[in-house]
């Protein structure tokens, strides 16, 4: 039986890390978070990398991490919200695993991220406006790479994980 890796995409606050941990546990896969891998490798936080290297420096590190991580088997990978901006990342995600887009409304994302200081793009006067713009810009790219789209709003983590597991079983991926 082929044991494909699962890649979670979606905006910040959609639940990729939370869902990813539960999903990995159910599948007996390793859970990895691309942002955490970058922080571990550099010894710096994502906001610190943004401050020192700018968004372009962070995106270069993210591209290298996604290339490396997507080559591993039997992992559940939570990607950063902007990972899909890079065409090579989209190609690697699509071709190397099963991609799940965790979708949520802007209002829900605002609620989930409002106290999180570890999200450099939201450190503005109007995080809601930033999230709307990001969803408008990135939404079609999330859709483009997704094998499965799951609405995470007002649904428990366990229900989201069950929906993913059901689809993986239906497509004989697990």
Swiss-Prot record:
At the top level of its lineage, which domain of life is listed?
Bacteria
Locations listed in the record: Cytoplasm
From the record, give the transmembrane residue ranges.
Answer: none
Cofactor(s) required for function per UniProt? Mg(2+)
Q: Which GO terms describe its molecular function?
A: ATP binding; magnesium ion binding; shikimate kinase activity
> Major location, coarse class?
cytoplasm
Q: Where does substrate bind?
A: 35, 59, 81, 138
Disulfide bridges in this chain: none
Q: What is the role of this chain?
A: Catalyzes the specific phosphorylation of the 3-hydroxyl group of shikimic acid using ATP as a cosubstrate.
Q: Which family does it belong to?
A: Belongs to the shikimate kinase family.
Q: What is this protein called?
A: Shikimate kinase
What is the source species? Hydrogenovibrio crunogenus (strain DSM 25203 / XCL-2) (Thiomicrospira crunogena)
């Amino acid at each position: 039986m082929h044991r494909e890796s699962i890649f979670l995409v979606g905006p910040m606050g959609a639940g990729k890390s939370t869902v990813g941990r539960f999903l990995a546990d159910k599948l007996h896969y390793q859970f990895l978070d691309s942002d955490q891998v970058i922080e571990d490798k550099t010894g710096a936080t994502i906001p610190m990398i943004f401050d020192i290297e700018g968004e372009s420096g962070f995106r270069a590190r993210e591209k290298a991490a996604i290339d490396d991580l997507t080559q591993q088997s039997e992992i559940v990978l939570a990607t950063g919200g902007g990972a899909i901006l890079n065409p090579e990342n989209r190609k690697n995600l699509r071709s190397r695993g099963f991609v799940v887009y965790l979708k949520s409304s802007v209002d829900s994302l605002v609620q989930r991220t409002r106290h999180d200081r570890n999200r450099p793009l939201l450190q503005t006067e109007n995080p809601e406006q930033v999230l709307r713009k990001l969803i408008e810009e990135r939404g079609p790219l999330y859709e483009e790479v997704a094998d499965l789209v799951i609405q995470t709003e007002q649904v428990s983590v366990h229900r989201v994980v069950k929906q993913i597991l059901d689809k993986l079983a239906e497509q004989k991926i697990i």
